[in-house]
């Protein structure tokens, strides 16, 4: 299983990956993790990824283009890695991998929010059936 996290604070996850159950799962190659900063996909020199709400109002919103591009990037990277794991002969025998490798990949993109569903053991079991999870973490005050 591959879990990719899109976050404005990628350094927050360093300690999380290097301890306890997550660390052991990574070492046993049962899990791979990655963190992508949407600032890397910003369209200006300041790395800006937030903007004022359309129509005015208080607060700030995350801009869509850097988030979309970050998600597209981690999906493309995973598809490339999994596709490169097959030789040409194996790909010819496995018709579902020809053309669009993502057809055979079970993936879920989840935008984390303050009003979302609680994370339960049942939800963990459901998500564990996917090949790739992409978690988009917002920044809330």
Locate each region found by the language model.
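Short, flexible coil/turn micro-motifs enriched in small/turn-prone residues
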Residues: 50-54, 133, 140
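N-terminal nucleotide/polyanion-binding subdomain common to many enzyme families
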Residues: 1-75
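S-adenosyl-L-methionine/SAH cofactor-binding core of RNA-modifying enzymes
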Residues: 63-87, 91-93, 97-135, 139
């Amino acid at each position: 299983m591959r879990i990719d996290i899109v976050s404005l604070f990628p350094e927050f996850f360093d300690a999380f990956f290097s301890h306890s159950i997550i660390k052991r799962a990574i070492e046993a190659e049962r899990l791979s993790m990655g963190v992508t900063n949407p600032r890397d996909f910003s369209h200006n020199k300041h790395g800006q990824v937030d903007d004022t709400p359309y129509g005015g109002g208080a607060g700030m919103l995350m801009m869509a283009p850097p988030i979309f591009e970050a998600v597209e990037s981690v999906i493309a990277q995973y598809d490339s890695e999994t596709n490169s794991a097959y030789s040409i002969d194996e790909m010819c025998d496995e018709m579902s991998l020809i053309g669009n490798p993502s057809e055979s990949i079970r993936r879920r993109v989840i935008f984390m929010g303050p009003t979302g569903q609680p994370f339960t053991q049942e939800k963990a079991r459901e998500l564990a059936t996917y090949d790739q999870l992409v978690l988009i973490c917002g920044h809330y005050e």
